[in-house]
């Protein structure tokens, strides 16, 4: 099972302190730390699974997903494929290791949302260009 580090500065972020509801905060932590979140920064899980794991009801989850996507711009949600893309995941969870990049590329075959795959591929390209 992967180890996920959370930057403790998250708890000092004024947006989280002032604007996130308790459900937004909890769901955000769940998305960041779930074993269902791939190395590429995409969580793949139906709402029923998220509800089971978090003990939030589906309406609470949908409300928080909407907040995290539209209000706070932390994620993108693809309802059809049950996938959540964490925006800027790479800033906190990737290194410039070529082995890591190769592992991330392998995880993309599990992602159905083409928009999410393209986002991650663009991010990988930027990382490769930084290493040159």
What are these regions (language model features)?
Residues 1-79, 90-130:
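Positively charged, structured surface patches that bind polyanionic biopolymers
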Residues 82-87:
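Minor-groove-contacting beta-hairpin "wing" of winged helix-turn-helix DNA-binding domains
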């Amino acid at each position: 099972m992967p180890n996920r580090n959370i930057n403790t500065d998250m708890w000092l972020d004024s947006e989280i302190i002032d604007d996130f509801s308790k459900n937004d905060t909890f769901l955000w932590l769940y998305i960041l730390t779930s074993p269902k979140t791939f190395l590429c920064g995409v969580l793949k899980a139906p709402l029923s699974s998220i509800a089971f794991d978090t003990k939030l009801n589906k309406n609470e989850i949908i409300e928080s997903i909407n907040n995290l996507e539209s209000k706070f711009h932390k994620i993108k949600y693809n309802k059809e494929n049950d996938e959540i893309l964490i925006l800027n995941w790479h800033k906190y969870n990737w290194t410039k290791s070529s082995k890591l990049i190769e592992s991330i590329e392998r995880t993309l075959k599990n992602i159905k949302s083409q928009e999410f795959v393209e986002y991650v591929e663009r991010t990988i390209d930027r990382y490769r260009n930084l290493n040159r």
